[in-house]
């Protein structure tokens, strides 16, 4: 029995949810998202709640049950509150600047790195902090991971791009022989 799958999702005010076959359509204002559920998961909209249940008792149906409930919940939260990830840049001369729909990063390379911001993502740069915001949890995490990947934090001095809540395990440097 899926503990996540059996919990109903309350539909907040202002969010429209329609079920067309296996396709769940979410809409709030001008934001619209779709979730294509597999044929082995039942979806019902009852009493302003979205209910999920497995069609069969096979392993795959039970696995998809909790997965699709979590995906639908993330869409509802994304439409109402949004998601954000915060990155910090540490290092001498390391900086970030926003130029239109391009994030320009100076991370100690011989050239600046230009990162094209995907559609539906908002990036706010404040000194050495980059905030990635959007309504799709997967895309926000992916963009933050791609920015971090340009210069991951190194364990000796901690220079690089890291998540704000990430803890870097530091290493001791070399000791001289006597």
From Swiss-Prot:
InterPro entries listed in its UniProt record: Ribosomal_uL6-like, Ribosomal_uL6-like_a/b-dom_sf, Ribosomal_uL6_a/b-dom, Ribosomal_uL6_bac-type, Ribosomal_uL6_CS
Role, per record: This protein binds to the 23S rRNA, and is important in its secondary structure. It is located near the subunit interface in the base of the L7/L12 stalk, and near the tRNA binding site of the peptidyltransferase center.
The keyword DNA damage belongs to this UniProt entry's keyword annotation: no
Name the record gives this protein: Large ribosomal subunit protein uL6
Family listed: Belongs to the universal ribosomal protein uL6 family.
PROSITE patterns, per the entry: RIBOSOMAL_L6_1 (PS00525)
SS bonds (residue pairs): none
The entry's keywords: Ribonucleoprotein, Ribosomal protein, RNA-binding, rRNA-binding
Pfam families: Ribosomal_L6
Stored HAMAP family: Ribosomal_uL6_B (MF_01365_B)
GO terms assigned for molecular function: rRNA binding; structural constituent of ribosome
Domain of life according to the entry: Bacteria
One BP term from GO: cytoplasmic translation
Assembly and interaction partners: Part of the 50S ribosomal subunit.
Organism of provenance: Campylobacter jejuni subsp. jejuni serotype O:2 (strain ATCC 700819 / NCTC 11168)
NCBIfam families: L6_bact (TIGR03654)
rRNA-binding among keywords: yes
One Gene Ontology cellular component annotation held by this UniProt entry: cytosolic large ribosomal subunit
